[in-house]
Structure formats: C-alpha cells, structure tokens
From Swiss-Prot:
Record note on domains: The presence of a 'disulfide through disulfide knot' structurally defines this protein as a knottin.
Protein family per UniProt: Belongs to the cyclotide family. Bracelet subfamily.
Tissue/organ expression: Expressed in seed but not in root, nodule, flower, stem, shoot, leaf and pod (at protein level).
Protein function: Probably participates in a plant defense mechanism.
Disulfide bond is among the record's keywords: yes
Any one of the GO BP annotations: defense response
PROSITE patterns, alphabetized: CYCLOTIDE, CYCLOTIDE_BRACELET
Tagged with keyword Metal-binding: no
Cited SUPFAM superfamilies: Cyclotides (SSF57038)
Cysteine pairs bridged by disulfides in the record: C4-C21, C8-C23, C13-C28
Name of the protein in question: Cliotide T11
C-alpha cells in the first residue's frame, strides 16, 4: 500500500519491482 514513485501504465514496474513493489491502479505499490 505504499507508493513507490513509479507508474506502470505502459510498462511494468522495473526498478521498484526489485524493491518488492507491484503494479496496482497504474502505480507501483509496496504493501
């Protein structure tokens, strides 16, 4: 539930995905 500062509208989460973030509502979130 914490925004990671990366969007995933056109491409999936990349750098933040390494930190455990996942795509939700076009934004990368962690918990």
């Amino acid at each position: 539930g914490i925004p990671c500062g990366e969007s995933c509208v056109f491409i999936p989460c990349t750098i933040t995905a390494l930190l455990g973030c996942s795509c939700k509502d076009k934004v990368c979130y962690k918990n």
